[in-house]
Curated annotation (Swiss-Prot):
Catalyzes the oxidation of cysteine to cysteine sulfinic acid with addition of molecular dioxygen. Binds 1 Fe cation per subunit. Ni(2+) and Zn(2+) can be used to a lesser extent. Induction: By increase of sulfur amino acid intake. It catalyses: L-cysteine + O2 = 3-sulfino-L-alanine + H(+). Gene3D superfamilies: Jelly Rolls. Fe cation binds at H86, H88, H140. The thioether cross-link between Cys-93 and Tyr-157 plays a structural role through stabilizing the Fe(2+) ion, and prevents the production of highly damaging free hydroxyl radicals by holding the oxygen radical via hydroxyl hydrogen. It comes from the Eukaryota. This is Cysteine dioxygenase type 1. GO terms for biological process: cysteine metabolic process; L-cysteine catabolic process; L-cysteine metabolic process; lactation; response to amino acid; response to azide; response to cAMP; response to ethanol. Its cofactor is Fe cation; Ni(2+); Zn(2+). Belongs to the cysteine dioxygenase family. Keywords: Dioxygenase, Iron, Metal-binding, Oxidoreductase, Thioether bond.
Amino acid sequence: MERTELLKPRTLADLIRILHELFAGDEVNVEEVQAVLEAYESNPAEWALYAKFDQYRYTRNLVDQGNGKFNLMILCWGEGHGSSIHDHTDSHCFLKLLQGNLKETLFDWPDKKSNEMIKKSERTLRENQCAYINDSIGLHRVENVSHTEPAVSLHLYSPPFDTCHAFDQRTGHKNKVTMTFHSKFGIRTPFTTSGSLENN
């Protein structure tokens, strides 16, 4: 879908409406989606409803299901919380910082031998900055390294997925994990005792 003029979302609801338009077809224009996410100025009054924290781990909070084409969610990172090294199950992954800072570390895919994984790059994402990754780029880990400030990020995955692989940095060994939502549409999901691992 060609855009002669990029639409600037004024609100989170506006952003969601534009994303539905961008994902109406079968093709994903990565640059266009990223530009729209970057154009949205974070406003806590708009996303606070979805920002549900947990004392012990970061949380995944579903905002919109994108008519089956994408999942839009808000991840809440308490002080010192981080993800495992993980893949994205052949999906597009867009990330936008809404509050605070997050450290993203990229890794190469491990080789067949049992060796320590190779770090490709590392960067700090700040409020309103965006990032993009897919499995052809590599694997990543996302962390809130602050001991005093929480962080909140907006994530879009297309197509949606509910399992991925988590990797051991020391050996490259991978495990398949199931991801759960801490809340859906602002409502806390029922507590489950399953062994699922929340990833982003």
